[in-house]
Amino acid sequence: MPIIESALGVEKAFEIATASQNVVAMAIGLEDYTADLGVSRTKDAKESLYARTRIVNACKAAGIQPIDSVFSDVADEEGLRINVKNSKELGFEGMGCIHPRQIAPIHESFAPEKSEIEKAQKIINAFKEAEEKGLGVVSLGTKMIDAPVVKRAQTTVKLAIELGLIEKDWYLVSSHQ
């Protein structure tokens, strides 16, 4: 797994991500990256926003997993959780750890919440029902459901299954309730 730690690495992120079929994930190392820029890391992370979004975009375009940098303050669990939330919102699918006490909060924060899973299941079910009826357009509540929304819902459900949060055959159970 390559770790991008320089301005040049950020600019060549897609090239690195696609350099070999063995590359399945790519991370950013923000301590080295910010040192390369000659700036300090800050809590609001403005100094690394470009690099982080560039890494996520390169990874997604290459079909690999983007991994965010470690959170250096091992005593600040609340700060870690906020950082992980921000990482997830940017599109990262994981984060490095520098201390064992960071593992559980990171896993919990990247796992989909119950409400996210339930919403994703409703979207998938509504889309399947519409397909079965031959409808090209479907809505759930006041929101239109299109292919990107369904894809995002499928990703959420797949992760929930992989983490053991729901059963693999959830759709059989939920459609008969």
Task: Give residue ranges: language-model regions.
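Expand to "…catalyze enediolate/carbanion chemistry for C-C bond making/breaking, isomerization
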Residues: 1-177
